[in-house]
UniProtKB/Swiss-Prot annotation:
Job description of the protein: Component of the coat protein complex II (COPII) which promotes the formation of transport vesicles from the endoplasmic reticulum (ER). The coat has two main functions, the physical deformation of the endoplasmic reticulum membrane into vesicles and the selection of cargo molecules. It also functions as a component of the nuclear pore complex (NPC). NPC components, collectively referred to as nucleoporins (NUPs), can play the role of both NPC structural components and of docking or interaction partners for transiently associated nuclear transport factors.
Protein's recorded name: Protein transport protein sec13
Main location: membrane
Membrane-topology annotation of the record: Peripheral membrane protein
Originating species: Aspergillus oryzae (strain ATCC 42149 / RIB 40) (Yellow koji mold)
Keywords: Cytoplasmic vesicle, Endoplasmic reticulum, ER-Golgi transport, Membrane, mRNA transport, Nuclear pore complex, Nucleus, Protein transport, Repeat, Translocation, Transport, WD repeat
Length: 294
């Protein structure tokens, strides 16, 4: 199994694996039952992501086959007293020429937007609007894009600012096999995503990036690398173009970083099957608060 994710309500679990399928389970209390197996990919499925429920019951998947598939659960009108729901593939995006390693939905305030990171060096952004899908695709990292994460829709400090700006921002960070992180901003006039910042520091592939959902006074991005470090990049609202980083060192190659919903705790996992939790102390240093062994 390569990825697993609960839907917004925690009632559905989707998993994906090397057998080219996606499985949907219903969670009821302590039990779960398989309700659907989705087939459509021609290679290992690396990543799945649930859209926000305001857009419907929608799941995106990406695979080694270079495709991004969008699946939707729809209610079937039948004479049966039991509700019948069926999953259908509603969009097949196959413009990438190599593995699509990660898909990530934008914050729902920005619209129904899906960003996709591919080994072909390109990022695509799919948008569902007025009952149809449109896409943009652009070159991002020379040696391939491994990961992608959206910034929160509200900019840092907008909650505490006396005169907040337009608030809605469309930006995301990518991590590449060129050891770099890149931050991309949407320009509403040109309707394109432009590179606004390159963050250097890792000495090997950046495997995962995660933008913290916190929108207090700082922005935080965590990155996990094959160089056995996690870097936590911070930018203050008073100087948004300036990013400082702190390095956390490990004994193993690192695969994933993930923030808690409030954005104050970071989970790190790597090649040793351990998960560690980290928190910023009052001096601004990141400290390990817990080790979880499988």
């Amino acid at each position: 199994m390569h990825d697993a994710g609960l839907d917004y309500y925690g009632r559905r679990l989707a998993t994906c694996s090397s057998d080219k399928t996606i499985k949907i389970f219903e969670i009821e209390g302590e039990t779960h039952r398989l309700v659907e197996t989705l087939k459509g990919h021609e290679g290992a499925v690396w990543c799945i992501a649930w859209a926000h429920p305001k857009f419907g019951t929608i799941l995106a998947s990406s695979s080694y086959d270079g495709k991004v598939l969008i699946w939707r659960e729809q209610h079937q009108n039948t004479t049966s007293p039991v509700a019948v729901n069926t999953w259908t593939k509603v969009f097949d995006f196959s413009l990438h020429t190599a593995s699509v390693n990660m898909v990530s939905w934008a914050p729902h305030e920005s619209g129904c937007l899906l960003a996709c990171a591919s080994s072909d060096g390109h990022v695509s952004v799919l948008e569902f609007q007025d009952n149809s899908w449109t896409h943009q695709i652009f070159h991002a990292h020379g040696m391939g894009v491994n990961s992608i994460s959206w910034a929160p829709a509200a900019s840092p400090g907008s909650l505490i600012s006396a005169n907040p700006g337009p608030g809605q921002q469309r930006r995301f960070v990518t991590g590449g096999s060129d050891n770099l992180l890149k931050i991309w901003d949407y320009n509403s006039e040109t309707k394109s995503y432009n590179l606004s910042q390159t963050l250097e520091g890792h000495s090997d592939w950046v495997r995962d990036v995660a933008w913290s959902p916190s929108i207090l006074s700082k922005s935080y991005i965590a990155s996990a690398s094959q160089d056995k470090t996690v870097r936590i990049w911070t930018s203050d609202v008073s100087n948004p173009g300036q990013w400082a980083s702190q390095q956390l060192e490990f004994d193993t190659v690192l695969w994933r970083v993930s923030w808690s919903p409030s954005g104050n705790i970071l989970a790190v996992s790597g090649g040793d099957n351990k998960v560690s939790l980290w928190k910023e102390n009052l001096k601004g240093q990141w400290e390990k608060v817990k080790d979880i062994e499988e």
